[in-house]
């Protein structure tokens, strides 16, 4: 049977990046002890008050269709959170609730870009980005960011890539996979480019609450940017709610109207009991949230400490997020070959940097998703793998 060209645009290297993770999961299911550091799924449970809110909502009979745009109570809380964190004044009409930030990104791209449009994206990039932009026929124009520069975008390099076909920039800070955050001066320079060339800014801020060093800057808060910025966020990482699929877009009211139309034919709204749980998540600070954030910071510091003096390895200290990139080029192997060897011989699953783009070649990404002792053991095995390759084990 014949399939649409669309199926080819959403396949490719990004989809294949998860193969090593699925191999590791298969071995876990067979009873092997594998240390899984290959995916950004928090090892924490969702805080109990959030879970209870969903249960209470279900018991109250909230199992019917909900507002396609998202419950007003939830959208108001999201608007308040965004206003508090960014300084940008927004209201509930500038918020659309969707099934996670991944869905939010897909919806925004469908509403902003046409076939043949160009979007400038920092590379390395999250593995689904290319497929998401390709789905609408847009062309990704990568701006390489290198480990030697801390994986940070340089505004002058972005400027050199702008053409008459450029329609948008898409950036995330803290960055996935590197955890690098952009300073205010860089955001201001990028904002000037957006205004000068009439571009959209798609700002993925999923890791903004896991920023340990520096200041989080939301580009929508900068002068002239509110009407040309779509801000994406979710509860997945900050609240350990990856499986709940709660995300949103904050943007101009006109964009939100288009997103609502797309949500109508794509989702028909998020489940009300999940939205009620999300309301509880955003109602008041939960002590579990700061505890999780502090745990990620300690884990980051632990990995840097454990690998800092390991021959053949150079861990790169992230500003935030839940990953650490490690330069393994001195071992002589490609990142994919190193990751395969690490899984096959040492029982540790990580992602190869090549999965995120050529600028991350020679690096591996490991998730801060295990407790201190398993993470320390994973670092020991990573160091041993490198030492074997250098003939020092």
UniProtKB/Swiss-Prot annotation:
Signal peptide span: none
> Which pathway does this polypeptide act in?
Amino-acid degradation; L-arginine degradation
The primary gene name is: aruH
Any single GO molecular-function term of the entry would be: pyridoxal phosphate binding
- The keyword Transferase appears for this protein: yes
Q: Which reaction does it catalyse?
A: L-arginine + pyruvate = 5-guanidino-2-oxopentanoate + L-alanine
Specify the species.
Pseudomonas aeruginosa (strain ATCC 15692 / DSM 22644 / CIP 104116 / JCM 14847 / LMG 12228 / 1C / PRS 101 / PAO1)
Quaternary structure annotation from Swiss-Prot or TrEMBL: Homodimer.
Which pairs of Cys residues are joined through disulfide bonds in the record?
none
Q: How does activity depend on pH?
A: Optimum pH is 9.0.
Q: What induces it?
A: Induced by L-arginine in the absence of ArgR, via the AruR/AruS two-component regulatory system.
- Keyword entries, A-Z: Aminotransferase, Arginine metabolism, Pyridoxal phosphate, Pyruvate, Transferase
Q: What is this protein called?
A: Arginine--pyruvate transaminase AruH
Task: Point out residues bearing the modification N6-(pyridoxal phosphate)lysine.
Answer: 237
